[in-house]
């Protein structure tokens, strides 16, 4: 009986996974720059504590310096910014995707424990934002021809889901506050890493041989009223075009003479 139930659950999970991937494929952009811009904006939004942590602190009456300090001291261990920077792009995307999946689970647990009234609409907004980020992360991996590698789960925990003992309400509130604080900090790190992706691509374009060649070439145009036009291009040598009124165009192959001498 248990084996049949496990098989049914596994089949349902795989079906939902395939459906979510199909929906993500249908809604994916073909522009990497557009996806990167969206991910940066989404990370900035979710990294802002006003989107979730601050409303939670006010709702749970934790808005004192000591209680705020307790939140940071009980923060949940998310992947650090230095760790994220050292990851390859595929592994980074996989880590973000998997971590946000865990965050969704913790938010659902948080709702069940505390928020049985519609007094915390920010929670639903945060959930929709996370789903949007995960979709764009999947699309970015697909656009880069990378499969989302699922990394080994890190040893993290959340005050919203600790159930080894029956904690008092206050400690549970502090634990959940620490989880939200760690989540915002993680998303801020994700946004900074995504901005480094953008800076790296811009720097690569600036340092391309074509741009360097153009940068080393200088054009100077000199016009004399009604008589002649001189166009000079310099990069080691100088070419001069002289056009006189009523005469044909003269184009020397190479010259180091001044326009005045040739005229």
Curated annotation (Swiss-Prot):
Biased composition, class Basic residues, residue ranges: 241-252
Disulfide bonds: 28-139, 71-177
Entries under SUPFAM superfamilies matching the protein: 4-helical cytokines (SSF47266)
Signal sequence residues: 1-24
Gene3D superfamilies listed in its UniProt record: 1.20.1250.10
Pfam families referenced in this protein's UniProt entry, alphabetically: LIF_OSM
Sugar-bearing residue positions: 30, 44, 145
Intracellular or extracellular location(s): Secreted
Keyword Thylakoid: no
InterPro entries hit by this protein: 4_helix_cytokine-like_core, Leukemia_IF/oncostatin, Leukemia_IF/oncostatin_CS, OSM
Region Disordered: start-end pairs: 241-263
Function field: Growth regulator. Inhibits the proliferation of a number of tumor cell lines. It regulates cytokine production, including IL-6, G-CSF and GM-CSF from endothelial cells. Uses only type II OSM receptor (heterodimers composed of OSMR and IL6ST). Involved in the maturation of fetal hepatocytes, thereby promoting liver development and regeneration.
Protein name per the record: Oncostatin-M
Species of origin: Mus musculus (Mouse)
């Amino acid at each position: 009986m248990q084996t049949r139930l496990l098989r049914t659950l596994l089949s349902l999970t795989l079906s939902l996974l395939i459906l979510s991937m199909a929906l993500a494929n249908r809604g994916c952009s073909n522009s990497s720059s557009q996806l990167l811009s969206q991910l940066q904006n989404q990370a900035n939004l979710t990294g802002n504590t006003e989107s979730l942590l601050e409303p939670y602190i006010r709702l749970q009456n934790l808005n004192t310096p000591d209680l705020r300090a307790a939140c940071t001291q009980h923060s949940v261990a998310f992947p650090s910014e230095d760790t994220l920077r050292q990851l390859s792009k595929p592994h980074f995307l996989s880590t973000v995707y998997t971590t946000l999946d865990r965050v969704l689970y913790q938010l659902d647990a948080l709702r069940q424990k505390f928020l049985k009234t519609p007094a915390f609409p920010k929670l639903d907004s945060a959930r929709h934002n996370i789903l949007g980020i995960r979709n764009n992360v999947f699309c970015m991996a697909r656009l880069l021809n990378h499969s989302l590698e699922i990394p080994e789960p890190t040893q993290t925990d959340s005050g919203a889901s600790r159930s080894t003992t029956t904690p008092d309400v206050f400690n549970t509130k502090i634990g959940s506050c620490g989880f939200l604080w760690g989540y915002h900090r993680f998303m801020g790190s994700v946004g900074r890493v995504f901005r480094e992706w953008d800076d790296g691509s811009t720097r690569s374009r600036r340092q391309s041989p074509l741009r360097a060649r153009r940068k080393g070439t200088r054009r100077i145009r000199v016009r004399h009223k009604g008589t002649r036009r001189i166009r000079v291009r310099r990069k080691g040598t100088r070419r001069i075009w002289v056009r006189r009124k009523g005469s044909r165009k003269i184009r020397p192959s190479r010259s180091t003479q001044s326009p005045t001498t040739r005229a």
